[in-house]
C-alpha cells in the first residue's frame, strides 16, 4: 500500500467460512448497540467491507478498533459548517475510548476559544491526549465566544478523534478529526496486521511517521463563536484578513494566501485590512483530488457486502448461515430529520457458535 495510509491489509486471501462477521460501531448510548455506518439512509462503500466479512469471531484478540473519519461520508468540512455540528452542553460527563488504527484525514481542526473576559472556553487536554497525527489541512480557529457553559460536544453523536484516543468533547489547542470508532473482526489473530510494511519501501524511509504526510495549517479568527451571528475571517497575517465563506476549499485558501503575498495586497498600515472575494470567483479547486484519495462516493451503492446485506430481505439458509444475530431493520422513511444520524440502530443479540465436523452451527444465547 506504500505510505498512503495507516491501514495495511494482509496479502494472503482470507479463508471462506461463515458470514458471522460484522463491523460494530461503538456508540456512547447504553440502550442499544448499533451496527454499520449510515449516511442519508445509505451505506457507504469502504475497504472494510472487502476484507472483514468472511469469518467468525473466535477470540477477542481478533477485535481491532479503528477510527473512521466522517469526511469520508461526504460531510461539509469547511469551518463555518463544521463548527455548527459542535455545541456546548452542561451536566454531561465526557467519555474517552482508545483505538488502534485510523485513516488519513484531509481536514482537522484546532480550537482556542476564550470568553470576552479572557477566560478559557475549552478544557485543557488530559495527559496522554495528543494531536491527531495524520492531517493534510489543520484548520486552526482562535477567537472569542459567549461559551454558555459546560463542554463542547458533537451534536450528531460522533467522536472527536485524537492520537489513538477518541473523546466526546473538544480539548483546547489540540488537533482533532471528526469520526466514529469501529471494531474490525479479523479472520484470525495477526500481530502484524496493522504493522505490515509497504510492498515497496521508500528510498529515504524514516521512522518519523509525520514525515509521510505534509501538513498545512490554515489560521482563522472568529467572533461570537457558537452563535447565530458567528463571523469567521481567514487570517493572512496579523493585520490582513479575508471574509470567510463556506464555499472556500482549503486549496483555494492556500492559493489565496500566496496571491495576497505575491501581489502585495497585505495591509501596509497599522490598521486591519479585510478583503471580500468576488462572488463570481470559482473557489471549488482541489475537491476532486480529495475524493479520489478517499475512494468514496456520495451516491448510494449496490455492492453485496456484509454491511449492505442488512438492507436486503433475509433469505432461507442452512443453520450454518442463518442470521440469528440481527433483528429486522426498521423500514426506511423519507421524513426529514433535524439532525443526521451516523449509525444504524439495530439491536445486537449475542449468539454462541459450535464447530462440529468442520461445520459451524450458531444459536442465540
Swiss-Prot record:
GO CC term (a single one): extracellular region
Gene Ontology process terms (BP): monoatomic ion transmembrane transport
InterPro entries referenced in this protein's UniProt entry, alphabetically: GPC_FiloV (IPR014625), GPC_filovir-type_extra_dom (IPR002561)
Keywords: Cleavage on pair of basic residues, Disulfide bond, Glycoprotein, Ion channel, Ion transport, Secreted, Signal, Transport, Viral ion channel
Disulfide bonds: 108-135, 121-147
Signal peptide per UniProt: 1-32
Chain positions of site Cleavage: 324-325
Pfam families, per the entry: Filo_glycop
Sugar attachment sites: 40, 204, 228, 257, 268
Alphabetized GO MF terms: channel activity
Record-stated family: Belongs to the filoviruses glycoprotein family.
Annotated protein name in UniProt: Pre-small/secreted glycoprotein
Lineage of origin: Viruses, Riboviria, Orthornavirae, Negarnaviricota, Haploviricotina
Amino acid at each position: 500500500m506504500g505510505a498512503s495510509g495507516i491501514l495495511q491489509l494482509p496479502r494472503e486471501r482470507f479463508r471462506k467460512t461463515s458470514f458471522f462477521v460484522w463491523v460494530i460501531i461503538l456508540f456512547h448510548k447504553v440502550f442499544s448497540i448499533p451496527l454499520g455506518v449510515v449516511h442519508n439512509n445509505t451505506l457507504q462503500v469502504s475497504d472494510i467491507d472487502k476484507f472483514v466479512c468472511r469469518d467468525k469471531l473466535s477470540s477477542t484478540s481478533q477485535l481491532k478498533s479503528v477510527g473512521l473519519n466522517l469526511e469520508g461520508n461526504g460531510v461539509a468540512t469547511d469551518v463555518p459548517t463544521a463548527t455548527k455540528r459542535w455545541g456546548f452542553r452542561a451536566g454531561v460527563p465526557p467519555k474517552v475510548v482508545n483505538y488502534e488504527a485510523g485513516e488519513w484525514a484531509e481536514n482537522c481542526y484546532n480550537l482556542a476559544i476564550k470568553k470576552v473576559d479572557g477566560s478559557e472556553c475549552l478544557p485543557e487536554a488530559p495527559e496522554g491526549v495528543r494531536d491527531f497525527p495524520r492531517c493534510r489541512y489543520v484548520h486552526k480557529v482562535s477567537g472569542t465566544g459567549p461559551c454558555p457553559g459546560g463542554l463542547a460536544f458533537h451534536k450528531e453523536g460522533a467522536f472527536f478523534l485524537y492520537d489513538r484516543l477518541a473523546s466526546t468533547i473538544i480539548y483546547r489547542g489540540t488537533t482533532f478529526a471528526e469520526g466514529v470508532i469501529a471494531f474490525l473482526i479479523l479472520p484470525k489473530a495477526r500481530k502484524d496486521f496493522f504493522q505490515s510494511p509497504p510492498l515497496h519501501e521508500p528510498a529515504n524511509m524514516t521512522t518519523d511517521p509525520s514525515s509521510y504526510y505534509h501538513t498545512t495549517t490554515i489560521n482563522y479568527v472568529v467572533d461570537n463563536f457558537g452563535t447565530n451571528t458567528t463571523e469567521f475571517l481567514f487570517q493572512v497575517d496579523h493585520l490582513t484578513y479575508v471574509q470567510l465563506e463556506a464555499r472556500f476549499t482549503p486549496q483555494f485558501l492556500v492559493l489565496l494566501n500566496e496571491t495576497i503575498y505575491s501581489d502585495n495586497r497585505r495591509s501596509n498600515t497599522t490598521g486591519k485590512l479585510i478583503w471580500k472575494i468576488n462572488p463570481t470567483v470559482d473557489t471549488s479547486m482541489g475537491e476532486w483530488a480529495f475524493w479520489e484519495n478517499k475512494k468514496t462516493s456520495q451516491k448510494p451503492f449496490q455492492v453485496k457486502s456484509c454491511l449492505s446485506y442488512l438492507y436486503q430481505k433475509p433469505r432461507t439458509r442452512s443453520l450454518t448461515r442463518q442470521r440469528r444475530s440481527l433483528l429486522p431493520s426498521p423500514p426506511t422513511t423519507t421524513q426529514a430529520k433535524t439532525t443526521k444520524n451516523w449509525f444504524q440502530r439495530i439491536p445486537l443479540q449475542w449468539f454462541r457458535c459450535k464447530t462440529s465436523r468442520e461445520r459451524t452451527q450458531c444459536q442465540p444465547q
